[in-house]
């Protein structure tokens, strides 16, 4: 029991440091930075959260994927389409958030099924995710006024928040994602991901459904 508690403390201590330091940086960032820097960093914080997922897949599972930007775009465009063509309200915003996540998950599940459930190599997954980005771009460009084409979706109503508030939201999101990623890679599930990267065939011999784990 004492060894288990000590292990939990060793795992949670870095998470507490990440949250504390991150909260301080995010909290005081808009106070010491000019509005232009806050605007740029808000976008950068969101992109950093997406980059963390690339690190998990490539760094810990050995799968080079180009699809994170596509999944990000699918979720964002799902919400944007709802706001543009249906309208905006707090309840619609919640529905758009849920539908955006579900749409991205559905496409990711389809890509995972194509890439991992047919005995294909990780290179095949890289090619599929690269093609997905190209397909998403062409769909948006070909959608005309419905998708905004090359100009994107603009002019729809949203929450009337200051750039400082958006900075805090983006920073808080990155802190949560970073802490979650740390807990994942230092858990039993994280060790399984590393084992799949090192020797996937042996993991299958041990009864692990590696295709399901990689898709998840």
Annotated model-derived regions:
Residues 1-216:
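Transmembrane alpha-helices and adjacent helix-loop boundaries
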């Amino acid at each position: 029991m004492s060894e288990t508690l000590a292990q939990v403390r060793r795992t949670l201590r870095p998470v507490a440091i990440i949250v504390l330091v991150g909260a301080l940086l995010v909290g005081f960032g808009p106070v010491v930075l000019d509005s232009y820097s806050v605007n740029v960093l808000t976008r950068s914080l969101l992109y950093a959260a997406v980059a963390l997922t690339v690190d998990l897949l490539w760094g810990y599972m050995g799968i080079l994927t180009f699809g994170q930007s596509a999944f990000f775009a699918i979720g964002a465009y799902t919400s944007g389409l709802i706001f543009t063509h249906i309208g905006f309200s707090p309840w619609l915003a919640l529905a758009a958030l849920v539908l955006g996540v579900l749409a991205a998950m559905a496409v990711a599940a389809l890509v995972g099924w194509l890439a991992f459930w047919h005995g294909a190599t990780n290179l095949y997954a890289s090619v599929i995710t690269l093609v997905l980005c190209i397909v998403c771009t062409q769909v948006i460009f070909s959608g005309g006024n419905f998708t905004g084409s090359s100009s994107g979706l603009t002019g729809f109503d949203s929450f009337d928040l200051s750039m400082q508030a958006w900075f805090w939201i983006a920073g808080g999101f990155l802190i949560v994602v970073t802490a979650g990623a740390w807990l994942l890679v230092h858990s039993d599930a994280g060790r399984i991901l590393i084992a799949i990267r090192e020797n996937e065939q042996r993991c299958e011999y041990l009864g692990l459904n590696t295709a399901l784990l990689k898709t998840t």
